[in-house]
UniProtKB/Swiss-Prot annotation:
The family this protein is said to belong to: Belongs to the RNA methyltransferase RlmH family.
Enzyme class, spelled out: transferase
Organismal lineage: Bacteria, Bacillati, Cyanobacteriota, Cyanophyceae, Synechococcales
rRNA processing found in the keyword field: yes
Protein name (record): Ribosomal RNA large subunit methyltransferase H
Short name of one Pfam family: SPOUT_MTase
Organism in which the protein naturally occurs: Prochlorococcus marinus (strain SARG / CCMP1375 / SS120)
C-alpha cells in the first residue's frame, strides 16, 4: 500500500501565493507524513548541489521536467505501487527549471503535463496527484474514470 511518508518533495523557491499555500495545506493534512522542503532559489548550480546532496542512498530521485515521461493518473498510481517500499524524492525546479545535472542524476524524469505550469503550481498539482495515486491504490471513490 502507498504511504505518504515514503514521499518527499524538494522544491526550489518559496510559495508566495496564499491560495497555493492553502491548497498545499489541504494536501499536507490529507497526506500525513508527506515532506515538502523548500530550497533557496538562486544560482542553478547551487540549487543542483542542494538537491543532489540531499538525496539519501535508499531514495529514488524523480525530476519533474517538461520533457519527462508522461503518466495518466492510473498509470502513476500503479507505477508508484510497483516501486514497493522505496522512498521517493520528487525534485521541482524554480523559475529556471532543473539543471541538466539533476535531470541526469535522476532515476526518472516525469512530466505533469504537456502544458507548462509555474513552479509553485507544480507543487500543488504533484501533491494532488500523490493523493489521487494513494486513493486509487485504496480503491477510494476520489478518482473517477
Amino acid at each position: 500500500m502507498l504511504n505518504p511518508s515514503r514521499f518527499r518533495i524538494l522544491a526550489i523557491g518559496k510559495v508566495r501565493k496564499s491560495w497555493i499555500q492553502n491548497g498545499l495545506e489541504v494536501y499536507r493534512k490529507r497526506l500525513p507524513g508527506l515532506s515538502i522542503t523548500e530550497i533557496r532559489d538562486g544560482d542553478i548550480k547551487k540549487e543542483s548541489r542542494a538537491i543532489i546532496s540531499s538525496i539519501k542512498k535508499d531514495e529514488l530521485l524523480i525530476a519533474l521536467c517538461e520533457e519527462g515521461e508522461k503518466f495518466t493518473s492510473m498509470d502513476f498510481s500503479h507505477w508508484l505501487q510497483n516501486l514497493g517500499s522505496s522512498r521517493i524524492v520528487f525534485a521541482i525546479g524554480g523559475t529556471n527549471g532543473l539543471s541538466q545535472e539533476v535531470k541526469t542524476s535522476a532515476d526518472l524524469c516525469i512530466s505533469l503535463s504537456a502544458l507548462t505550469f509555474p513552479h509553485e503550481m507544480a507543487r500543488l498539482i504533484l501533491a494532488e496527484q500523490l493523493y489521487r495515486a494513494i486513493s486509487i491504490a485504496k480503491g477510494s471513490p476520489y478518482h473517477r474514470e
